[in-house]
């Protein structure tokens, strides 16, 4: 995923030589299931010394059930850069977001449409008030990093906006908390960025759902590979998936393909997911 999606404090951390960072993501979740679960994202971030930090823009589109339910959002963020010393820097980020959810009621099927002999042929008498709802949302985060390690904390959906098509005040987007960190270890014992291993962990919590991804990147020249394990905890806890990545990098450009292999009880119906990223 885009770094600024994980933590708004990461805005500006990808700048190199005064330039910015563009990241594009496409994810197809469980393509073997009926319907589609597709997420597309595009982000840009850049550091500006004149304003003491970085800015970011993130556009997200999520589609479920062959367009039955869609969500779009646009987020803009700023991270304040605070050098602690020559080797270690802190960043404090904030982000504002406008989001919109839409539902295509015509693709839903209701009980009163069923004819015992002919199936779904009748017109429904169900009434709905709206097919679209918009909301304003906010996030904040903190990041500490050096050349060889990083760690961060972030909180999303701070205002817990209502996302109900019927105005139900209880249908909120719950707060999401994220903790993440990692190391960059040169494999030849010297400061050689061409050959490194980077163990990392990401921990997310949202209401009763808790998830941890743990694994590593391996970089050798232009080659980038990685392997992670995803575990969920609590009421919905299980060993969820293995994730593998292969890609390459050239100067500032990176391209990667990742493959999720489900290892939980859902693997028979939803064995795989696929994601492509470039930036």
Where are these regions (language model features)?
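Subset of outer-membrane beta-barrel
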Residues: 1-279
């Amino acid at each position: 995923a885009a770094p600024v999606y994980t933590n708004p404090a990461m805005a500006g951390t990808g700048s190199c030589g005064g330039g910015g960072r563009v990241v594009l993501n496409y994810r197809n979740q469980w393509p073997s299931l009926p319907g589609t679960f597709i997420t597309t994202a595009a982000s840009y971030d850049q550091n500006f010394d004149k304003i003491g930090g970085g800015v970011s823009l993130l556009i997200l589109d999520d589609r479920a059930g062959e367009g039955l339910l869609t969500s779009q959002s646009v987020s803009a963020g700023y991270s304040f850069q605070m050098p602690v010393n020559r080797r270690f820097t802190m960043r404090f980020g904030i982000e504002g977001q406008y989001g919109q959810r839409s539902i295509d009621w015509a693709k839903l099927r209701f009980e009163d449409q069923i004819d015992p002999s002919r199936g779904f042929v009748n017109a429904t008498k169900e009434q709905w008030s709206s097919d679209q709802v918009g909301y304003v949302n906010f996030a904040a985060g903190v990041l500490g990093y050096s050349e060889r390690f990083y760690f961060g904390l972030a909180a999303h959906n701070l205002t817990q906006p209502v996302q109900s098509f019927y105005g139900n005040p209880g249908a909120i987007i719950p707060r999401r908390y994220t903790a993440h960190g990692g190391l960059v270890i040169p494999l030849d014992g010297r400061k050689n960025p061409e050959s490194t291993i980077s163990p990392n962990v990401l921990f997310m919590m949202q209401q009763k759902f808790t998830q941890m991804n743990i694994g590593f990147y391996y970089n050798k020249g232009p080659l980038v590979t990685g392997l992670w394990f995803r575990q969920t905890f609590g009421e919905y806890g299980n060993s969820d998936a293995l994730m593998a990545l292969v890609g390459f990098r050239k100067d500032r450009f990176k391209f990667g393909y990742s493959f999720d292999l489900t290892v939980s009880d859902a693997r028979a119906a939803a064995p795989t997911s696929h994601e492509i990223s470039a930036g």
